[in-house]
């Protein structure tokens, strides 16, 4: 929630104010976001291995401290170099103290209800997005420097105590996966254990499957849209469509509300129906939504974008984790996600750069958003082809 509220979903508003104060181009501001996503992608395999080995709590604690200090230093920047350096700190802190680290714990705690559990965990991020108008009010009333300083202090004050609640595996507290210790007979328990063991891939085994690469590429294509919206939708609404910063913040809040509905629906749908088919539908919705906002000529089109993109993002996001966990098992999940991030980072970093560069050249976001929408549509075919891999070979005992 803190990462979504203070940074990821609020960054578009910072872009507008930083442009006004320093005169930096959209490409330069998008470049900072892109470089930090590359940095986080490279960090992914190491981070995943550390979480698998030492558990999520210590990694979360380190990440929260780096994130908070990064925001405090960000409030003092006076050049593009110091902006990039502090932004890199924020990104590293967000990676270590956020999504990927927490998902390792959730995947280990849930099996039958995994998609629902992941969906509920994503609600925190969405709740942060709903509060973006409050961040924008603070930005407009007190300036971006004060808001950044306050954000860093809030992160440290709230994040560190919350970390104490996180446990790596149910065995640490004497619990069972899915919290149901007595519902299965000893025979059924044995059968489930054998099944789970057969589905457990090492990182090396997972990377030998086509599904690993197809899911990662499809995820990257989705993030072409998600990342470009994070960075550029507020500038597009204010500069291109004539909305005020506060009105743009309300659009972000509406989009986030739709995202929350999507997450709740996605958890149920993901546990009941084919996850790949759901992901394909979401990729198409991402593409249509971005095309709608690119050529919006009426507020109804802006609302349509918020609905389509928010629902697609909310439904698809948790399934990216659940699908990998279903295919490759929980034992090496952190490491597998880490190596996958090396591919996913190209979408997360490329989207803002493409949109920003083409906006600087042509004076609007229409072409950039169109190109990225096509990329999302192409990504739907990756999920179509990502069939479940065969269980890895085991040495006979």
Task: List each model region and its residues.
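Symmetry-related core transmembrane helices of the 12-TM Major Facilitator Superfamily/SLC fold
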Residues: 148-164, 367-385
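Extracytoplasmic
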Residues: 1-26, 43, 47, 132, ...
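Extracytoplasmic gate region of multi-pass secondary transporters
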Residues: 11-15, 204-261, 351
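Intracellular juxtamembrane helix-capping segments at the cytosolic ends
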Residues: 18, 96-110, 315-328
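Structural signature of the two symmetry-related core transmembrane helices
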Residues: 59-72, 277-291
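Central cavity-lining transmembrane alpha-helices of secondary-active solute carriers
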Residues: 34-47, 253-266
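Helix-loop-helix hairpin linking two adjacent transmembrane segments in secondary transporters
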Residues: 125-171
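Hydrophobic core of transmembrane alpha-helices in multi-pass small-molecule transporters
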Residues: 82-97, 301-314
């Amino acid at each position: 929630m803190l990462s979504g509220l203070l940074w990821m979903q609020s960054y578009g508003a910072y872009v507008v104010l930083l442009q006004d104060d320093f005169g930096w181009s959209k490409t330069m501001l998008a470049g900072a976001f892109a470089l930090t996503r590359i940095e986080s992608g490279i960090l992914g395999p190491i981070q995943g291995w550390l979480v698998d080995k030492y558990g999520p709590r210590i990694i979360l604690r380190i990440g929260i401290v780096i994130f908070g200090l990064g925001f405090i230093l960000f409030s003092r920047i006076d050049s593009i170099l110091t902006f990039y350096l502090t932004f890199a700190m924020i990104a590293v802190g967000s990676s270590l103290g956020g999504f990927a680290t927490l998902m390792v714990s959730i995947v280990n705690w849930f099996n039958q209800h995994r998609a629902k559990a992941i969906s509920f965990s994503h609600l925190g991020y969405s709740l942060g997005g709903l509060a973006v108008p409050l961040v924008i009010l603070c930005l407009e009333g007190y300036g971006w420097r004060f808001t950044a300083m306050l954000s860093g202090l809030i992160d440290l004050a709230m994040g560190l105590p919350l970390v104490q609640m996180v446990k790596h595996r149910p065995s640490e507290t004497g619990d069972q996966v899915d919290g149901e210790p007595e519902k299965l007979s000893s025979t059924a328990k044995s059968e489930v254990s054998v099944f789970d063991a057969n589905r457990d891939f090492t990182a090396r085994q997972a990377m030998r499957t086509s599904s690993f690469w197809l899911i990662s590429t499809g995820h990257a294509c989705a993030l072409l849209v998600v990342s470009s919206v994070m960075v550029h939708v507020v500038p597009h609404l204010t500069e291109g469509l004539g909305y005020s910063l506060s009105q743009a913040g309300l659009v972000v809040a509406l989009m986030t509300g739709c995202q929350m509905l999507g997450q709740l629906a996605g958890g149920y749908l993901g546990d009941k129906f084919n996850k790949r088919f759901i992901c394909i539908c979401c990729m198409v919705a991402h593409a249509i939504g971005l095309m709608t906002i690119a050529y919006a000529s009426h507020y109804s089109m802006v609302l349509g974008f918020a609905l389509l993109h928010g629902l697609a993002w909310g439904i698809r996001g948790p399934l990216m984790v659940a699908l990998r966990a279903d295919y490759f098992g929980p034992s090496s999940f952190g490491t597998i996600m880490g190596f996958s991030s090396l591919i996913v980072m190209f979408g997360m970093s490329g989207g803002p750069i493409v949109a920003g560069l083409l906006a600087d050249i042509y004076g609007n976001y229409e072409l950039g958003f169109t190109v990225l929408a096509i990329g999302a549509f192409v990504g739907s075919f990756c999920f179509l082809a990502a069939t479940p891999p065969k269980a890895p070979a085991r040495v006979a005992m």
